[in-house]
Each structure stands twice: as C-alpha cells, then as structure tokens.
Amino acid sequence: MGTNIETSLKKRTIYFDRVFWQEGFALAGPKELKGKLGDKFDFTLINDKFDQDTFEKAERKMFETALDGLLAKSKKLPIEIDVVLGGDLLNQCVSTSFAMRKSSASFLGLYNACGTYAESMILGAALVDKFLDNAVCVSGSHFSSAERQYRYPLELGVLRSPMTQWTCSGVGCSLLSRE
C-alpha cells in the first residue's frame, strides 16, 4: 500500500533542481505601514495616490517602484531578466501590464486573485528550472482600485464595519534564478 501512495505522489509532484530564490522586494501602503509588519517593508507609500491622479495610476507606479527596487537590491540589470510573471486584481491585469510597458523582459500576465503570487512562483520556477536564467514573480493590489471593482466604489460612500475585509495596498516581487 505504501508504494502506491508514493507512486501517486510522485506523479503529482513537480521537483525543481536548479531554481533558487535570489531576492525579494515588498512595497506597502499607508494602512499596512501602521500594522505589525510596518517596519519590515522595503518601501512604503505616504499617501494612497502615490502622487498620481488616480488610484489605478498609483497602482501602476507601485508595480514600477517594486520592480525597480528588486533590480536594485539584486544588482541585476533589466536586460538580465528573461521573463516577468505576475498580475493584479484589475481586469486584464491593467496595472501590471502598463508597468511592464518599459521593460525589455517578456511578460506573462496572470490573473488568479489572491493566488496570483503563488501561481507566478510555480510557473517561474518551472521556467527557470528548464529554460530560463532569471524570472521575476510579482503580484499586487491597491485597496481603492480593487474596492471599485469588487465591492463598493469609495465614491459611493458606503459605511464599512470595523470587521470588514480590507484589500492590501501593496506589491511583492521575487527574483528566481538558476544561480
């Protein structure tokens, strides 16, 4: 019986031999800064709009800042990144897609809501293990733009219970590499 379970697990498990987590970068909004992990973030926003006209533009700038920060921390040049895998909570991964316009790396947009980061890490690891040298995995959201799409637009003025869920304003990214 034990060998059947082991055989079954081997068929459903992906093993990575040549993938290493090299560096990470975490960007957070003002509300997250006030939390227990506030001093652990690499970069925090002073205001929700990040000096932009709209929350969506602020979210795009959050992605750009996090990706630039990751490259600086890892001492990698943009040309050394083979692919960026990631997404956000907006339709068509609009914030991530616009942030990637300036990048020389290939971009694979992912939309898996709260699972986007895990999905990007799994796909990134598979690509680095077999084909590529460096992959950036990224996911993020902005409370105000996600609220507009998923719950109640802030402009509607709906009162919130203190126990209501609160979407994070933040971006997390990691560099996966063969080295």
Question: Where are the predicted features?
Answer:
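Conserved "HGTGT" condensation-loop signature of ketosynthase/thiolase-family condensing enzymes
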Residues: 1-108, 166-168, 172-179
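Active-site-proximal alpha-helical scaffold in enzymes
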Residues: 111-138, 176
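Generic detector of solvent-exposed, compositionally biased contiguous segments
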Residues: 53, 61-62, 115-125, 152
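A generic local secondary-structure boundary/capping motif
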Residues: 9-12, 124-127, 159-165
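Short, conserved acidic/polar surface loops in the N-terminal third of protein domains
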Residues: 94-99, 119-121, 146-151
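Acidic, glycine-rich active-site loops and adjacent beta-strand->loop/helix elements
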Residues: 87-92, 114, 139-145
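Active-site glycine-rich loop that binds ribose-phosphate moieties when present
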Residues: 148-177
